[in-house]
């Protein structure tokens, strides 16, 4: 102790004698947690090389024998100078296009041979402040890790920027810029210009501008990369099933000789105008739904991540949560004042912060919506919150923390990488879930309504004389000036008017805990090869159980109920259209809003969709809440509320749907092509708007009520549960229901679907940007009944995808993400499609068509190249091998184990069938199904653009 004091004293004397030394005597923290009282999770290993590059390593075996590798460069579009707009993103593209040791075009091939699919396992992204390179390793082989690290080092310090490679990639980047244009981007740009006129970031969208991208030279891009890609701005992350010591040694061996360089300073970021007030803006577009945003700005506050700042942040979170919950209650009334509303305060990089009140309304409903939302906001800040409201929010927070702590040991690689990314970008310390729960419990008693209100008042910027922005299809008044005055007058009136909006919270308890006498078991067998237990209850309900230890305390629930889209007929094609709205109508004894309060703090949810030959219900829950989850889903099937609140929300949603029907090329295509290729079959055709406005919960009840009451049910549980306890829970819920049909109906007549006899060109028009087009080829194939053919077409899809990507993207530079797809139906007899798609410039339609037709014809003309075949097959092998390393994979395999047992056998033989396929097999499939004259060729063109004759 005395020695420590002496050392400190000597240090002080040295500092006093050398006044210029302090800056060098105390180095800046390397990691955010070094200036926090929060301890990082000790399972993470943090390090820094002498050159300044940082790294984070963590051993983790979820999923087993896999890993995630990330390279983050602290450089984004905010680091660009005026002549460099889009350069950070352009450089990201060039990382895949040639380096010292990997020639142009070889990086993706190298990874594909190793089993990494381009896009799914190999990707990158650029934001305002960062560039992130991502590799998902399907195996934990040291050689594969070495390859990943080698490629990351190539990206960091060895890119070549060959002029011809830059020129080829320029077309790809420009196509990505083109594809992103449209009403949504223009609306976003207008909002940024209004709210932040003096800020730099509004002119630094990562995609850049056409002018700067066209002007980018090899030398200019290389100069940007050399300036920004330096060790001090770089962090490497490796999380997965590798020995941490071995990973650290590999990182040092690969990156230690990267020369250190001084990082460039980021240019000035402009300003947020704290005194900006009293202005209004109106932005109109036929595709925009109505929204009013009320805003005020304030100064940015430096708040390091500490235990105290998290406590204060939690208080703020609770306050905003209560206000937004009040608004949610109003949005669920039979005649709501708005579709949705919310309030929050967020940072604007490091130059300011903004409080926004956002109100979404039906067309021409802005006045009532703005008035109501303003009153909710006023009342909260003036009068505070009730104990019950705060308790409801606390319950949700507590449960989230408890669930995280329970599942801590089996967090996925992706989740752990996400925690590291938060540390790097937001300086949020990656603490253990257990410590987060402990801190919450320590502070829980202090989370009072008064404390919540005080924290909220200190954080939210007063919305006095605010900025008001309107977006929508119809102006709020006859001209801009009158519209601005109307918006301001409504806001001011809402601030003066007496507070009169009251929505009471429910009382009582969840009413669906008794479904009758528990069901008896008619049969109970276990497949030893899968550890899959299969039970049939006496009432006909079937239960599949697969217990795993892959995700601690997590249980996935899936229910298939007979019916689905097969209830849609040519005479009644929208019979199941509103199915997904069923939970919005609540239950017979509880509204949806009541359920949210009654079940606060419980890990349960409900959803239902009409999918293929069944209605599908799904949820994720915990061991503790498994029975409640089953009760909730059983109640949704046996006693849905059918409330008219769901009608109102659905009709508003469909109004917006039709406003955007052809607003972009992709929406025009997706809403038109199914009808085209199905010969105008009403079941696959968008009906007139009035058809959807006539749909109601009452009509849905008439159309699907019988299936809910009597249809066959298959229930599957996958995850961490006690099997016998789970069987008893199922017996008390689904097993206790009245007798169901024992089997799923065959629906033979309803399964008929015919591909249009009209082949060749069809033109679809869109109302988007004048230079945007889509080229899509669709060939009819077959259904999914033959596993060998299905596997062959899937492999052919991968081969064609590589070929099309190489030609349309890499060689021609015409499209950002050309794609192929083989889709074989398990529902419609004989129905399947093989699709090639590319989003291109209108001027490039003809060249793209030629490239696609030539590529597909080549697949039929000759056996595929052996290297391309290997690159296509390897990622498929990895997907098969890794399927059962997650609960989601087990669920996909077992969810129809009783009604479609052939799926299990197909899985066991999948790898063998894949490996047996030859180049000649694929050539035969291409000849059989991909004949040039058998395709429907859909061209999606702007309105008014000339179309080819054929």
Across the structure, where does each feature detected by a protein language model lie?
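N-terminal secretory signal peptides that target proteins for export/translocation
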Residues: 1-5
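Bacterial N-terminal signal peptides
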Residues: 8-18
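Proteolytic maturation boundary segments
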Residues: 23-57, 237, 243-314, 319-328, ...
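M16 family metallopeptidases and their MPP-like homologs
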Residues: 56-58, 63-82, 86-88, 105-154, ...
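Metal-associated gating/positioning segment near the N- to mid-region
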Residues: 94-102
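Hydrophobic, small-residue-rich alpha-helical packing segments that form membrane-like cores
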Residues: 157, 165, 170-220, 224-233, ...
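Internal metal/ion-chelating core segments
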Residues: 212-252, 692-731
């Amino acid at each position: 102790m005395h020695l420590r004091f002496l050392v400190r004293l000597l240090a002080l004397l040295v500092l006093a004698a050398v006044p210029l030394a302090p800056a060098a005597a105390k180095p800046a923290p390397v990691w955010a947690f070094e200036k926090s009282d929060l301890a990082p999770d000790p399972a993470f290993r943090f390090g820094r090389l002498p050159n300044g590059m940082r790294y984070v390593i963590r051993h983790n075996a979820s999923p087993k024998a896999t890993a995630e590798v990330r390279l983050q460069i602290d450089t984004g579009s905010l680091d660009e100078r005026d002549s460099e707009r889009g350069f950070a993103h352009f450089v990201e593209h060039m990382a895949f296009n040639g380096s010292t040791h990997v020639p142009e075009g070889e990086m993706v091939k190298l990874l594909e041979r190793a089993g990494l699919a381009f896009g799914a396992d190999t990707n990158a992204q650029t934001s305002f402040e960062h560039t992130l390179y991502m590799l998902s390793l399907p195996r934990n082989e040291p050689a594969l890790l070495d390859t990943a690290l080698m490629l990351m080092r190539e990206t960091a310090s060895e890119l070549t920027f060959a002029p011809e490679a830059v020129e080829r990639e320029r077309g790809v980047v420009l196509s990505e810029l083109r594809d992103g244009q449209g009403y949504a981007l223009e609306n976003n740009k207008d909002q940024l210009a209004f709210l932040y006129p003096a800020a730099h970031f509004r002119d630094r969208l990562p995609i850049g501008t056409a002018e700067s991208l066209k002007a980018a030279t090899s030398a200019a891009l290389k100069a940007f990369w050399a300036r920004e890609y330096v060790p001090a701005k770089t962090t490497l992350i490796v999380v997965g099933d590798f020995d941490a010591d071995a990973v650290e040694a590999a990182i040092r061996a690969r990156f230690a000789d990267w020369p250190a360089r001084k990082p460039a300073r980021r240019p000035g970021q402009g300003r947020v105008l704290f005194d900006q007030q009293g202005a209004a803006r109106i932005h109109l577009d036929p595709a925009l739904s109505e929204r009013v945003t009320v805003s005020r700005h304030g100064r940015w506050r430096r708040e390091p991540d500490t235990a105290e700042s998290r406590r204060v942040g939690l208080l703020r979170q609770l306050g905003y949560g209560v206000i937004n919950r009040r608004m949610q209650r109003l949005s669920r009334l039979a005649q709501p004042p708005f579709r949705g509303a919310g309030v929050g305060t967020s940072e604007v990089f490091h130059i300011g912060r903004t409080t926004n009140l956002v109100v979404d309304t039906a067309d021409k409903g802005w006045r009532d919506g703005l008035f109501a939302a303003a009153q909710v906001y006023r009342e909260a800040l003036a009068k505070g919150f009730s104990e019950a409201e705060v308790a409801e929010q606390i319950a949700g927070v507590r449960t989230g923390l408890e669930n995280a702590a329970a599942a801590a040991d089996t967090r996925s690689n992706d989740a752990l990488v996400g925690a590291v990314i938060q540390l790097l970008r937001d300086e949020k310390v990656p603490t253990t879930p257990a410590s987060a729960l402990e801190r919450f419990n320590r502070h829980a008693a202090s989370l009072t309504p008064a404390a919540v209100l005080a924290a909220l008042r200190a954080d939210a910027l007063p919305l006095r004389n605010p900025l008001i922005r309107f977006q929508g299809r119809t102006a709020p008044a006859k001209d801009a000036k009158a519209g601005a005055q109307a918006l301001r007058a409504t806001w001011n009136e809402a601030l003066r008017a007496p507070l009169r909006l009251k929505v009471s919270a429910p009382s009582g308890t969840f009413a669906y805990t008794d479904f009758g006498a528990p069901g008896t078991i008619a049969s109970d067998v276990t497949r030893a090869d899968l550890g899959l237990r299969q039970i049939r209850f006496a009432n006909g309900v079937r239960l599949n159980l697969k217990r795993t230890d892959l995700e601690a305390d997590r249980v996935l629930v899936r229910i298939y109920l007979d019916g689905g889209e097969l209830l849609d007929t040519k005479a009644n094609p929208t019979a199941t259209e509103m199915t997904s709205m069923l939970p919005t109508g609540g239950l017979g004894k509880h509204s949806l809003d009541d359920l949210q309060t009654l079940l606060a703090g419980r890990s349960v949810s409900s959803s239902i969709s009409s999918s293929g030959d069944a209605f599908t219900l799904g949820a994720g829950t915990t061991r503790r809440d498994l029975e409640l989850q089953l009760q909730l889903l059983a109640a949704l099937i046996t006693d849905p509320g059918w409330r008219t609140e769901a009608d109102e929300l659905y009709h508003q949603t469909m109004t917006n749907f039709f406003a955007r029907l052809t607003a972009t090329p992709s929406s025009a295509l997706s809403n038109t092509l199914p009808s085209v290729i199905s010969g105008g079959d009403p079941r696959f055709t968008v009906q007139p708007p009035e058809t959807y406005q006539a749909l109601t919960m009452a009509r849905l009840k008439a159309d699907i009520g019988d299936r809910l009451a009597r249809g066959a049910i298959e229930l599957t549980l996958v995850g961490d549960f006690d099997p016998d306890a789970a069987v008893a829970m199922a017996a008390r819920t689904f097993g206790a229901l009245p007798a169901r049909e024992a089997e799923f109906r065959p629906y033979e007549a309803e399964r008929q679907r015919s591909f249009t006899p009209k082949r060749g060109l069809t033109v679809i028009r869109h109302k988007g940007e004048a230079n945007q087009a889509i080229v899509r080829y669709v060939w009819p194939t077959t259904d999914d009944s033959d596993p060998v053919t299905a596997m062959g077409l899937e492999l052919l899809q991968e081969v064609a995808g590589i070929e099309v990507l190489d030609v349309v993207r890499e060689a021609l530079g015409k499209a950002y993400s050309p794609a192929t797809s083989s889709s074989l139906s398990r529902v419609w007899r004989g129905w399947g499609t093989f699709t090639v798609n590319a989003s291109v410039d209108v001027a490039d339609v003809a060249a793209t068509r030629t490239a696609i037709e030539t590529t597909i014809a080549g697949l039929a003309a000759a056996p595929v190249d052996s290297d391309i075949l290997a690159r296509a097959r390897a990622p498929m092998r990895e997907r098969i091998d890794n399927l059962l390393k997650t609960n989601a994979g087990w669920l996909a395999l077992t969810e129809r184990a009783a009604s479609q047992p052939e799926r299990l056998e197909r899985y066991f033989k999948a790898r063998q069938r894949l490996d047996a396929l030859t180049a000649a097999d694929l050539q035969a499939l291409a000849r059989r199904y991909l004949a040039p004259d058998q395709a429907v060729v859909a061209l999606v063109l702007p309105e008014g653009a000339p179309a080819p004759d054929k």
